[in-house]
């Protein structure tokens, strides 16, 4: 079996699942990282099946971890090329699980952290069928060459003290999304660096619960 299709997952409390939540980790981590969020949110999202895929490549700046794309060359043009090259592999992972659960994009929620937010936002904007909603923690938006989806609601959450991905990236993303009239909200969290805390989790859960497809 393709290793990309082996990852941590947690079934919905209510069966059958009505929603699929895809958790996308940051660079140098793996799917075991964000699956750790599930115990804090599953009671509020009882009809959601959670998957946390591993990045599709080995992390190329350490002997362990995974990545969605290389960050050795961080120029926007290079990252865009790598996203175009790699995005279909993530799409395939999601489509396989959707088929297994008899769900579609309109039932799918994307939650990303850091590099996971970057690829999650990119994936959201290129979909022909909109996702239910997308949450991005501590990330940045890399614009695709063409936007196919302008209707998926997006929630951006970022620590004001982030010294890995500046909180300015949240404002840049918000400016871009506003330009294309894409529904979104942005939340700057005081006294928070490059991480997810209880405030961010609460914001994300409230956003998901109040999103109307």
UniProtKB/Swiss-Prot annotation:
Its EC number is 3.1.-.-. The active site is at residues 114, 162, 194. GO terms for molecular function: hydrolase activity. Keywords: Hydrolase. It comes from the Bacteria. SUPFAM superfamilies: alpha/beta-Hydrolases (SSF53474). PANTHER family: LYSOPHOSPHOLIPASE-LIKE PROTEIN 1, LYSOPHOSPHOLIPASE-RELATED. This is Uncharacterized hydrolase RBE_1307. It comes from Rickettsia bellii (strain RML369-C).
């Amino acid at each position: 079996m393709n290793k990309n299709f082996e990852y941590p997952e947690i079934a919905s409390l209510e069966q059958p699942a009505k929603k699929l939540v895809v958790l996308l980790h940051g660079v140098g981590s793996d799917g075991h990282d964000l699956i750790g969020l599930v115990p804090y949110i599953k009671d509020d999202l009882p009809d959601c099946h959670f998957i946390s895929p591993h990045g599709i490549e080995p992390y190329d700046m350490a002997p362990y971890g995974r990545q969605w794309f290389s960050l050795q060359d961080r120029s926007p043009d290079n990252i865009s090329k790598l996203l175009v090259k790699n995005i279909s592999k993530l799409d395939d992972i999601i489509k396989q699980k959707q088929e297994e659960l008899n769900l579609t994009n309109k039932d799918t929620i994307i939650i990303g952290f850091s590099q996971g937010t970057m690829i999650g936002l990119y994936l959201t904007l290129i979909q022909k069928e909109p996702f239910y909603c997308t949450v991005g923690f501590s990330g940045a938006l890399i614009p695709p060459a063409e936007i196919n989806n302008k209707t998926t609601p997006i929630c951006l959450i970022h620590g004001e003290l982030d010294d890995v991905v500046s909180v300015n990236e949240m404002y840049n993303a918000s400016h871009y999304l506003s330009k294309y009239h894409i529904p979104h909200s942005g939340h700057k969290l005081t006294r928070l660096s490059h991480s997810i805390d209880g405030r961010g989790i609460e914001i994300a859960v409230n956003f998901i619960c109040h999103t109307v497809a």
